[in-house]
Amino acid sequence: MENEFTYEDYETTAKWLLQHTEYRPQVAVICGSGLGGLTAHLKEAQIFDYNEIPNFPQSTVQGHAGRLVFGLLNGRCCVMMQGRFHMYEGYSLSKVTFPVRVFHLLGVETLVVTNAAGGLNPNFEVGDIMLIRDHINLPGFCGQNPLRGPNDERFGVRFPAMSDAYDRDMRQKAFTAWKQMGEQRKLQEGTYVMLAGPNFETVAESRLLKMLGADAVGMSTVPEVIVARHCGLRVFGFSLITNKVVMDYENLEKANHMEVLDAGKAAAQTLERFVSILMESIPLPDRGS
């Protein structure tokens, strides 16, 4: 499906936000399932429900509050999405990624994406954090791409490169920050693969995804990253490994959404510290003299 939004629609939303807040965010953070508590660390927070904001879709998933929160975190002006949008909710990819282009028009230069994911890599344990080094856009293999349709050069080029989608420098800084934290949880690095959902993957699908080189699997993030890179944003992402994907027919365990939320709660304090420390490594924009 082609983009149902015009450039003016994005502008309308951005202008509305700029008129209703004095914040001019440098960083946007998209909080995944069970990770919305990150917003509690924003100082002098200003909150907008999605239903207040022109053109904004509504979040329908448990663990996604559906709020846009502006504030300060470690000296960085931020906007955080407390709840994202998914294909499985019935949204087109242009709606799933709508906020990213709005963030670009607000002046955001760095996008931080977080998600809950199932571990495909046998070396991953529940509770590990995986820095996203690369992704596999499986819906894209079937023509589902957020950039499909006429290109608007005001956002970016027709054929954007994705070989460097996730910022290497920020990943290196993340490893340094993790060592400083002295955490017992493991910080991993790997490839994230996106499925459309909402059902969890079959054993055969899980085995195929592992053969493709994926380390973790989820139902989000990739469309947002594609649009962010199209807009020229720096991207940093990580996955919280909330379950080990079942790849054996003799294994009677079944993935479920509650374990995703529970893992998010258990890791909340660690992730909040992690993101807060990382903010210090994000370069401030050059506003000129």
From Swiss-Prot:
Changing T176S: In haplotype NPB. GO terms for molecular function: guanosine phosphorylase activity; purine-nucleoside phosphorylase activity. It is found in: Cytoplasm. Disruption phenotype: At 10-week old, mice have a smaller cerebellum, corpus callosum and thalamus and motor abnormalities. Normal number of Purkinje cells in the cerebellum at birth but numbers start to decrease as mice get older. Purkinje cells in the cerebellum have an irregular shape, a granular cytoplasm and degenerated dendrites characterized by fewer dendritic spines processes. Loss of inosine phosphorylase activity in cerebellum, liver and kidney. The keyword Amino-acid biosynthesis does not apply. Changing M258K: In haplotype NPC. Its main location: cytoplasm. It comes from the Eukaryota. Signal peptide: none annotated. Pathway: Purine metabolism; purine nucleoside salvage. Phosphate binds at S33, H64, R84, F85, H86, A116, S220. One of its GO terms (biological process) is guanosine catabolic process. A purine D-ribonucleoside binds at Y88, E201, M219, N243, H257. GO terms for cellular component: cytosol. Homotrimer. This is Purine nucleoside phosphorylase. The lineage of its organism: Eukaryota, Metazoa, Chordata, Craniata, Vertebrata.
